[in-house]
């Protein structure tokens, strides 16, 4: 693992990497705990190379905050990163990032003569921004600088800092920074207390009392799952539980939209319950996402594992949309042919995709999705021999894959779907309620494929099929965009000795009751 402390060293490292390798980036302030490590492990799983930054950012600390006593554990952090599979740690000094020594003084951190990134005031004046003016300007300034230096494909931030996550996502959209921002679930101690570098300021008794934050949020979540959506009802539930620990001093309790941070009167689709309080002198934050959408079932696995058949039948049985990702690639292939665009010209492909309005709808009378492109139904047209022969080359284009991942995520906003592919649970729907990794041995998949081809009148060699399937697995697992990987929280189902009905039964048992 490389230890880099200068911008020049970081740039040299990035230039030494193959351009086709994906880069994951986890920005931290060090003093790593299990929450950081879970994000780092996710980045290592998702990318070819992972870079972690360790930088205690002076610009995000206000006067009389804990900048000077914030724990610095660099050697320990580097060892944890190395153990987790990190490829490089970037640990610059404030001066290296253009923060003068004078600007590191308590009274002058935010008045240095440097460019400052200012996120939308409506996002920074609420929640933590009320008591920490200027904090998110400091965060946004350094995060922007780090993203420009590292130039990652994906950057990972914890959901515990939900306001920061929303602001960074907005910043990346507004400034057109070419990076995917990945939110990582909050990691908790056995008591429910969210991991935080500031937990070490707490005594054991204070930690126990602080666990009321999560209990109070869970109490509101229980009401939400029972159908309560009104702001007052949900906040009252939190306050009732908080009242059991009188030593806790509440700073704020809010129900907001998780993307815009606008306060909500009630939850229609999703809401963020956010809380900040002090236990002793230590300030703690926590939150829970309340999601009213119908469930998403993400089924991944290698080619030939039976995903398509199972996914269609699961969708029909549960009355959910079958998100036919294969049909989406076919529809894009049809559209490019209609536009007369050569797939050799990726910029022209990108332009054409911006004019492609793709819509899917379940076909209640059959197993297929009905597909429209710009209000023209193409359900049958995309199954033509010409489209079938061209779809593989179109699917290999990074710009097409990225476009369709965004389209698939759009369908996920309302939920109520079953999707199959190779990256549904890792890339497209990382927060799916049910994640399944459906697999089978190469030998079994080759046997199934041989039977299918023989039914169609073809004679095939089993050994050759096994070789082709093994090579397809290798290509799918190593492709630059959306490689085939099992999600950490996916349930693996080995189908070698299972019927379709048995596989479906196993998946249906994973769906939450009442969904």
Residue ranges, per PLM feature:
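Nucleotidyltransferase catalytic core that binds NTPs
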Residues: 2-249, 254-256, 260-262
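Conserved lysine of the Walker
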Residues: 307
